[in-house]
Amino acid sequence: MKILIHRGANQIGGCITEIQSAAGTRILVDLGHNLPGKSEKEDKFDDPANLSALIDGISGIIYTHNHGDHLGFFHQIPEAIPQYIGQMSRDVVLNILDESLNKADRSNRKSLIEEIQYKASRLKAFRTYISGQEFAVGDIKIKPYFVSHSAADSHLLLIECDGKRVVHTGDLREHGFLGKGLEKILRKYLTDVDVLITEGTMLSRGDEHIKSEREIQSMMEDLMTQYKNVFVLCSSTNFDRLAGLHKANARFKGRPFVCDVYQNRQFKTLTSYSGKHSDLYVIDDAVEMSLRKVNLHKKMIDKGFTMVVRDNPTFRKWIAYLMLLLDPSQTILVYSQYKGYLDEQANLQEFVKMFGSNMAYVHTSGHATRKTLQKICTLLNPKTAILPIHRDSESDFLSLEIADDLKDKVIIGSCCISGIDFDIN
């Protein structure tokens, strides 16, 4: 077996891991674009020659979830190379592409329309997997397990070949609504592990308290008690956040939960998949905003509301209209996503100003805390190696409170151990 970390050993996002079997089967786990705002002006794989060289001879690509820093190059992969992702993950991205297509249609941008249609066709050709059900690419076996993350339908992967068992965590956390299931998976299903490839996004955060999604929900409820009119700016696909927000709003009788058509489509996708397993993820009563819905506007002014917003021309029209009708002292914007976007995006700063002077920052990470990383390493206790990825170059995995024998297994450079070749870029 050979394990290559093409990218991710010294950066967050854009991770690319390759696993080769002795028989010559080669798979990639994630093929994502660098995160926006990074020091690199361009992603080197934006160059078709570099991407072509990377995927030459690859037997299949498995995506742990649908964030762009894991999935970003999917549409540039030749059809001959099979690509795999969770079924719900695929449908969530199809919803995003459908919304982009609607915008392109309205602006009559032919080249953009064709590009989006092509991406959708490539995504529809994906092979989908289900948590707990094994599939194979050549002689490499893969079994995905659901994990909590800020992207719904995220998975860690158990990968087996040449008599070795490798766990790739993808992105995960314990402080999401379903995060408590992680320990059960680690204890029951991931035994006798040889190699652990784990994210380390939060390594440099120290041991500070990281809020749980339940705490976030409680903070939202408190704000809804203080303010009648609550706008929330967050990712349209952060379903834990949106489900908690919906549940918080439901405690205030008569208050509509308002969104646009696209967001409601995502709610329907969430309900159809995750709603089968938990009522928390049933969001079937959202009301779609329109300037023509005068009765809805009257109800919002009378009862108050929670409205999920994004920065685009349609929402700007709606906000400009609504802010003329609302009492500013009873109105607040809850900013519930990465704070750095406010520093990086001038347009977002302008959008936020539309809501007046009341703003609250209510957010938590989608990634494993140091405590969770320690638990993963300790419970899996890999026999051969621990490979930290998806981490800042300055972060120190050895600063975790794990046993010395586990620290001895942390690999940050190329080597060969117990018949496994490690190549780390």
Walk through the language-model features, giving the residues of each.
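Hard-cation-handling environments
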Residues: 205-330, 389
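Catalytic core of the metallo-beta-lactamase
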Residues: 4, 12, 18-22, 131-189
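C-terminal regulatory/interaction regions
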Residues: 11, 251, 285-425
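Extreme N-terminal starter segment of soluble prokaryotic enzymes
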Residues: 1-3, 26
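Pre-active-site segment of Zn-dependent metallo-hydrolases
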Residues: 11-14, 18-63, 72-76, 85-121, ...
